[in-house]
Amino acid sequence: MFLGTYAPKLDEKGRIILPAKFREELASGLVLTRGQEHCVYVFSQREFQSLHEKIRQAPVTSKQARDYLRVFLSGASAEVPDKQNRVTVPPALRSYAGLDRDLVVIGAGSRAEIWDAEAWETYLAKQEAAFANTEEEVIPGLF
């Protein structure tokens, strides 16, 4: 499970050093893809395989499902960390998420997310008030 918030830097070659707490789960490989709210999702190979099995069940007759799958999967990139635990974020994903040198990597349970640091701060500031006022209906049975 991915938890926490980290602040790595993107190097000049577009690489990021994985947070130490994420390395074991991602050591054998990972998949980077477009995330919602213009971040980059990071899935372990195992989690992405599970997700892909669910995605395959989406009806081909649904235009909304086809559109989502095209955007989500066309941006996917399988990567393996190097010996220094660095992963290259492909240029298209860096551009999509507006990634600059300063990043924030957050744990989001089944995945990690890579955000431009400024974009994350803006997003978090907007969401904190809503978080404090979240009703049980958003995630029934949570509290």
Curated annotation (Swiss-Prot):
Biological process (GO), any one: negative regulation of DNA-templated transcription initiation
GO molecular function: DNA-binding transcription factor activity; transcription cis-regulatory region binding
First-listed, main subcellular location of the protein, grouped into a coarse class: cytoplasm
Subcellular localization(s) per the UniProt record: Cytoplasm, Nucleoid
Residue stretches making up the SpoVT-AbrB domain: 5-47, 76-119
CDD domains attached to this UniProt entry: MraZ_C, MraZ_N
Cross-referenced Pfam families: MraZ (PF02381)
InterPro entries referenced in this protein's UniProt entry, alphabetically: MraZ, MraZ_C, MraZ_dom, MraZ_N, MraZ_sf, SpoVT-AbrB_dom, SpoVT-AbrB_sf
Cross-referenced PROSITE patterns: SPOVT_ABRB (PS51740)
Origin superkingdom: Bacteria
An example Gene Ontology CC term for this record: cytoplasm
Key words of the record: Cytoplasm, DNA-binding, Repeat, Transcription, Transcription regulation
Oligomeric form and interacting partners: Forms oligomers.
UniProt record similarity statement: Belongs to the MraZ family.
Record-linked HAMAP family: MraZ
Name of the featured protein: Transcriptional regulator MraZ
